């Protein structure tokens, strides 16, 4: 019974729970790796005494956080749990494929971790650029294992994407049109489309890299008529949509959290929010070369990618101001999910502003591969995606588990994390402006002050992570029932109680639209 429930599950709630547990586990690995990085950089001089190992840790940190923490939790965890319940579907369209999507991830993570343990590890950075990643600069099977790991994670995501697209389009309850589905469902749909269109390009790129390494092809080797810049174009055609894949489900989560804790019955500008996500998804595919301003492109090409990148700020601004308008005039409940959501809006906006700075090709030539870029993407990931995950976890925890979180501890956790991540990443803007490059294990003494502060912030965040583990343990051990009056019972995912029954919407459900004149 136990084996068949958890290993052969076809229930979207159980698979969502597996994804959440897997993501939490991977998140702890990724956090441990980041603490090693910040410890190495906590003062001038060397700690690890091995730059190849340092770069391997950086590469693993990126892959683990992106493919095994953020994506499984947001798309696999929240997506599986909530999408069928929000559209009144009994389950996902392809329940067994859903199970396979999950079970491809643990082997993928094992391959990635084993790539660090054999030979000298894959010290390529998460971009895996040739010629650094070719068979000459990286001998041994490490990069090949990392490539196979990416293949498995990619297949998992593509299957999941097909499943979500089919479910959302075909399994909505009768009379529910696209413009009735909640914003979180919109965000998962757009994310799934982005995955479906971008991952095959990554698969092509890393497969060509694999044959370059092992079968003597020269796709990316100039000596045989290839071009390493081709790899960069292929990688970033996936890589840029990928960063929107990481943040879009967060947008959906924040829309739900902000609406409920502002005492509103719907978010401000529903249609604008949905169209803004579609615009972000579309624009995300036509700006990839802004990651490549330093490889030598024509001035016209640079002008196009600069302006196209800046245009993404418009739909993003629509979303930020719609969240603020949702809060405006509301009866705000200052509970942990709302704190995370407000932190998200503020810090994601800061990250967006540094993104506008970097979109200028002339400025990016100076700032490329410095800590300014690290600060920028950690503001949108470590304080965008992660804050959104935390907002969603605190908000839907009673739904997933049937127990309530201790609000005092949750608020303490928020303030510790808020302090920690800002102390970690804000000084990195100054380091980048002063010219400190990325992916180096040591630095001149002039950079030590900001690095010390940054590493202290990392320790603060680490304490916050330990407190989160305590909070979740405390909730399960205390077994407090959530107060039904404090739950958003008029939202479809909550109508089956906390936790919901194993099967929901077993009979066809019906949606009645009340049009208010």
Curated annotation (Swiss-Prot):
* UniProt name for this protein: Cytochrome c oxidase subunit 1
1'-histidyl-3'-tyrosine (His-Tyr) cross-link position in this chain?
A: 240-244
Which positions bind Fe(II)-heme a? 61, 378
Which pathway is this protein engaged in? Energy metabolism; oxidative phosphorylation
**Where does it primarily localize?**
mitochondrion
Query: Keywords for this entry?
Result: Calcium, Copper, Electron transport, Heme, Iron, Magnesium, Membrane, Metal-binding, Mitochondrion, Mitochondrion inner membrane, Respiratory chain, Sodium, Translocase, Transmembrane, Transmembrane helix, Transport
Which residues face the membrane's Mitochondrial intermembrane side? 41-50, 118-140, 213-227, 287-298, 358-370, 434-446
Q: Which GO terms describe its molecular function?
A: cytochrome-c oxidase activity; heme binding; metal ion binding
Which residues does Cu cation bind? Answer: 240, 290-291
């Amino acid at each position: 019974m136990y084996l068949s429930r958890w290993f052969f599950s076809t229930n979207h709630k159980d698979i969502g729970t597996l994804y959440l547990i897997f993501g939490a586990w991977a998140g702890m690995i990724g956090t441990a790796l980041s603490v090693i990085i910040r410890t190495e950089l906590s003062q001038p001089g060397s700690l690890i005494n091995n730059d190849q190992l340092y770069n391997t840790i950086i590469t693993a940190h990126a892959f683990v956080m992106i493919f095994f923490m953020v994506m499984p939790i947001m798309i696999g965890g929240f997506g599986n749990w909530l999408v069928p319940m929000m559209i009144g579907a009994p389950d996902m369209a392809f329940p067994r494929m859903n199970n396979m999507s999950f079970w491809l991830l643990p082997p993928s993570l094992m391959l990635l971790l084993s790539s660090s343990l054999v030979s000298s590890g894959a010290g390529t950075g998460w971009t895996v650029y040739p010629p650094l990643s070719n068979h000459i600069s990286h001998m041994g099977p490490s990069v090949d294992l990392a490539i196979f790991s990416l293949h498995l994670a990619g297949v998992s995501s593509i299957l999941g994407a097909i499943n979500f697209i089919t479910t959302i389009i075909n399994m909505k309850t009768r009379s529910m049109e696209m413009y009735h589905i909640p914003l979180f469902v919109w965000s998962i749909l757009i994310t799934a489309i982005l995955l479906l269109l971008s991952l095959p390009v990554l698969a092509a790129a890393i497969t060509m890299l694999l044959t370059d390494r092992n079968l003597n092809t020269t796709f990316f080797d100039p000596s045989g008529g290839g071009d390493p810049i081709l790899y960069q174009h292929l990688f970033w055609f996936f890589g840029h949509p990928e960063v929107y894949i990481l943040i879009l489900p967060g947008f959906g989560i924040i829309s739900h959290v902000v609406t409920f804790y502002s005492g509103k019955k719907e978010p401000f500008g529903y249609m604008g929010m949905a169209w803004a996500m579609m615009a972000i998804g579309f624009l995300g595919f036509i700006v990839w070369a802004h990651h490549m301003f330093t490889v030598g492109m024509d001035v016209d090409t640079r002008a196009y990618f600069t302006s196209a990148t800046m245009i993404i700020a418009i739909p993003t601004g629509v979303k930020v101001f719609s969240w603020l308008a949702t809060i405006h005039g509301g009866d705000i409940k200052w509970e942990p999910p709302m704190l995370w959501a407000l932190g998200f809006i503020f810090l994601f906006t800061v990250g967006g502003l540094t993104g506008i700075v970097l979109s200028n090709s002339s400025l990016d030539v100076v700032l490329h591969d410095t800590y300014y870029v690290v600060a920028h993407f950690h503001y949108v990931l470590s304080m965008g995606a992660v804050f959104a995950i935390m907002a969603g976890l605190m908000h839907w925890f009673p739904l997933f588990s049937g127990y309530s979180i201790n609000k005092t501890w949750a608020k303490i956790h928020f303030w510790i994390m808020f302090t920690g991540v800002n102390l970690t990443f804000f000084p990195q803007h100054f380091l980048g402006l002063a010219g400190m490059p990325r992916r180096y294990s040591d630095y001149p003494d002039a950079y030590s002050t900001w690095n010390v502060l940054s590493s202290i912030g990392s320790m603060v965040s680490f304490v916050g992570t330990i407190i989160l583990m305590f909070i979740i343990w405390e909730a399960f051990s205390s077994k407090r029932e959530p107060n039904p009056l404090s739950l958003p019972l008029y939202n479809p995912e909550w109508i089956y109680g906390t936790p919901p029954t194993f099967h929901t919407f077993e009979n066809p459900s019906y949606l009645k639209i009340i049009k208010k004149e």
